[in-house]
Amino acid sequence: MSETSTLDQDPDPIYRGRFVERLLALAPRSVLDVGCGTGGLLASLRSKVAELHGIDPDPVRINEARAVGLRVDRGDAYALPFDAQSIDIVTFQFVPHHLADWPRALAEALRVARHGVLVLEGWYDRSIPSQETAAQLEAWSKAIDRATGMVHEDYPSAGALTASLPATSHQRIEQQTHLVLRMRAMSDVEREGESQLAKLPAPDQARQLLQRHLAAARRTGVSYEGATILSVLRA
């Protein structure tokens, strides 16, 4: 594959790979992935971590994960079916922005984690014009999702992710940010905008706002989001 052919590809797999590297650097013997979906992270750890568990609320995704031999149970982030300090590392991949009560989920993960919690979340470097435009478009899109009943918040900052931790906590907190700057095709951005508008019974106001965002996008371009890796580790 030529270098040019990768310039408009979503760098998401790169960020997920770096998350796995960070996780394996901690040499866990057991991992629980919360909101594991079909088990992509667990599958990538199969030959590297002795004990793997996943939790997800979606029975369809659970069945897909189980079909390839992964140990995944139905549950949610607020009541993990594990004893205190029974799992080395608890992970969240692009999950916090789908949770109505992240502090509660983090507290529950820290209860279960023997060594700590790792989080992979989206992140924008808003000092870059194409990133700022992308962040504004995403905020517009997520507002529509929320209006139609979905829990879909903006990507939380590292400060927001750790705000609920007591100031006197003995956790070691580390943050890494990653950005592979690749531009999105405008046709894809426009198509996704129209798809979001179709969810609304009266989309006129949202359409006007979208047009303003698209005008900015034609000036700056729209780049894929970066990612932040947050580690909350027991000292």
Predicted regions and their residues:
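A short glycine-rich, Lys/Arg-flanked "PGG" loop and its adjoining helix->strand segment in the class I
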Residues: 103-117
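Conserved Class I S-adenosyl-L-methionine
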Residues: 158, 171-235
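Class I SAM-dependent methyltransferase SAM/SAH-binding core
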Residues: 38-79
